[in-house]
């Protein structure tokens, strides 16, 4: 008998219970002991295995995006962008690619209410014919900091106090007071969209600028946008308190039940593109993740649609073990965006920590196309490889290099040094523009929320004055409103 022919596939493929090694169990309700009232015997392997498995069934939580829900479906190209990219899954209208999507809250812990104010994750894994493409983003188009060196710090600032394990506004207001570029992110965070009504009515953004490369090797910067066809909807604090008090998983439940009922969620994918040679023509830095590309300057272009039409079969196998690692395919590449380049390491590294070095062998993470390399063995390797050559090149193995795909030369010059993005951006303009675009009642709600955060007793007068100064530079009336409600005289 070929032992590799019979691989574990289902927990229910025998009519009776077995041990992990397959031995039949005739009693799964009582321990082995010395008589009815005697002690348990160490030889009760069945009990030891059951308890040992139980105490090890949890894996490390994600460091961020711990609370999440997943669903499966497809992406279909609706508009021809073959002039922009040679990516196979975007080659022509009508092409469909299977996907799995994970929605999440960013900061809060696994099991926390989905009604808390928090950015949401929007991650899509495309199982293409040329490998997996992971597009990992959020429901905000911007991030709080622009340099990757500060990424761990901003996450820690938003997470609970390490002494009390309480999430306190003074911590992130203190940290971000050193980062005026965070203003636009706060204009999203404390806006109505800070609490989406569910995942189906939520936008998604790639946040960072990627590169699209076409067949001739021409490269363009690109940003990705997901727009829900059912519209964007959010909930106010009162509704969030009411729903969160009765159901911590309302968004997960809504997603699951909608798909089960045949009400399939759908999003449209749009892109913005900038020619590499045109990067310096704009009054904003295209590689800065703390600002957006104005749509009146860089218009949206439609690409395709994302449809989620199948629920996952097992939450642990297809949500907890689902791993996004910024995977790329020919025709899509990283840009010089510093946050993106750091994420390309961080995402894969955290999956190796959570799931082990062979996390890409797990069915939910493995590519659906043929794949081959000499990365083998290591913890939890379960791929049977009948081979004698595990190196490259070799005259005994027909494996060869693939056909080279277009990759433009990128000539770089500069000193090796630690420095910020050189172009001086206006940290306040887009935040002010966003605030002024709201109706008066929406503006008032934003002011109320930010004033409540600044009213944390641990927030010092110095920090309050810094934030009043920042918001005054974004919009003078906004700064005055915040100062008035705090009974503080603005300095600007």
From Swiss-Prot:
EC number: 1.11.1.6
CDD domains: catalase_clade_1
EC main group: oxidoreductase
Heme among keywords: yes
InterPro entries: Catalase, Catalase_AS, Catalase_clade1/3, Catalase_core, Catalase_haem_BS, Catalase_immune_responsive, Catalase_sf
Cofactor(s) annotated in UniProt: heme
GO MF: catalase activity; heme binding; metal ion binding
Gene Ontology terms: cellular component: peroxisome; plasma membrane
Keyword Metal-binding in annotation: yes
Active site positions, chain numbering: 65, 138
Alphabetized UniProt keyword annotations: Heme, Hydrogen peroxide, Iron, Metal-binding, Oxidoreductase, Peroxidase, Peroxisome
Chain sites annotated for binding heme: 347
A Gene Ontology BP annotation from the UniProt entry: hydrogen peroxide catabolic process
Superkingdom, taxonomy of origin: Eukaryota
Tissues expressing the protein: Abundant in green cotyledons, etiolated cotyledons, green hypocotyl and root, but not in young leaf.
Pfam families attached to this UniProt entry: Catalase (PF00199), Catalase-rel (PF06628)
Reactions accelerated catalytically: 2 H2O2 = O2 + 2 H2O
Chief place of localization: other
Subunit structure, interactors included: Homotetramer.
Record's function text: Occurs in almost all aerobically respiring organisms and serves to protect cells from the toxic effects of hydrogen peroxide.
Family designation: Belongs to the catalase family.
PANTHER family, alphabetized: CATALASE
Record's protein name: Catalase isozyme 3
Source species of the chain: Cucurbita pepo
């Amino acid at each position: 008998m070929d032992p590799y022919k019979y691989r574990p596939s289902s927990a229910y493929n025998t009519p009776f219970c077995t041990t992990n090694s397959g031995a039949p169990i005739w009693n799964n309700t009582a321990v082995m002991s010395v008589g009815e009232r005697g002690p348990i015997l160490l030889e009760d392997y069945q009990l030891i295995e059951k308890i040992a498995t139980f105490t090890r069934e949890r894996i490390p939580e994600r460091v961020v995006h711990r609370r999440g829900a997943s669903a499966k479906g497809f992406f279909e190209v609706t508009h021809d962008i073959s002039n922009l990219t040679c990516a196979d899954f975007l080659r022509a209208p009508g092409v469909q690619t299977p996907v799995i999507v994970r929605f999440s809250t960013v900061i809060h812990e696994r099991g926390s209410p989905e009604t808390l104010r928090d950015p949401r994750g929007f991650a899509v894994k495309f199982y293409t014919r040329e490998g997996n493409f992971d597009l990992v983003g959020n429901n905000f188009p911007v991030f709080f900091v622009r340099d990757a060196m500060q990424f761990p710090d901003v996450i820690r600032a938003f997470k609970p106090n390490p002494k009390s394990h309480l999430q306190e506004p003074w911590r992130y207001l203190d940290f971000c007071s050193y980062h005026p570029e965070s203003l636009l992110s706060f204009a999203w965070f404390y806006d109505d969209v800070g609490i989406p009504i569910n995942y189906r009515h939520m936008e998604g953004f790639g946040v960072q600028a990627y590169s699209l490369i076409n067949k001739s090797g021409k490269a363009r910067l690109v940003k990705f946008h997901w727009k829900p066809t059912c519209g964007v909807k959010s909930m106010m604090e009162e509704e969030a308190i009411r729903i969160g008090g009765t159901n911590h998983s309302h968004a997960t439940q809504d997603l699951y039940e909608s798909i089960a009922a045949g009400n399939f969620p759908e999003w449209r994918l749009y892109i913005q593109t900038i020619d590499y040679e045109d990067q310096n023509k704009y009054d904003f830095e295209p590689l800065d993740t703390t600002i957006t590309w104005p749509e009146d300057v860089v218009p949206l272009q439609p690409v395709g649609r994302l449809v989620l039409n199948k629920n996952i079969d097992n939450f642990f196998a297809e949500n907890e073990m689902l791993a996004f690692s910024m995977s790329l395919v020919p025709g899509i590449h990283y840009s010089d965006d510093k946050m993106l380049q750091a994420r390309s390491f961080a995402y894969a590294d955290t999956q190796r920590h959570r799931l082990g070095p062979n996390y890409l062998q797990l069915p939910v993470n493995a590519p659906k196309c043929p794949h081959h390399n000499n990365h083998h063995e290591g913890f939890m390797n379960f791929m049977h490889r009948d081979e004698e050559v595990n190196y490259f090149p070799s005259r005994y193995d027909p494996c060869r290099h693939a056909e080279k795909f277009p990759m433009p030369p990128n000539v770089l010059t500069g000193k090796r040094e630690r420095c910020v993005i050189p172009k001086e951006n206006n940290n306040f303009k887009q935040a002010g523009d966003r605030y002024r675009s709201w109706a008066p009642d929406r503006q008032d709600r934003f002011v109320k929320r930010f004033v409540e955060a600044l009213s944390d007793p641990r927030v010092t007068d110095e920090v309050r004055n810094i934030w009043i100064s920042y918001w005054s530079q974004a919009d003078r009336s906004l700064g005055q409103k915040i100062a008035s409600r705090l009974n503080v005289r603005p300095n600007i």
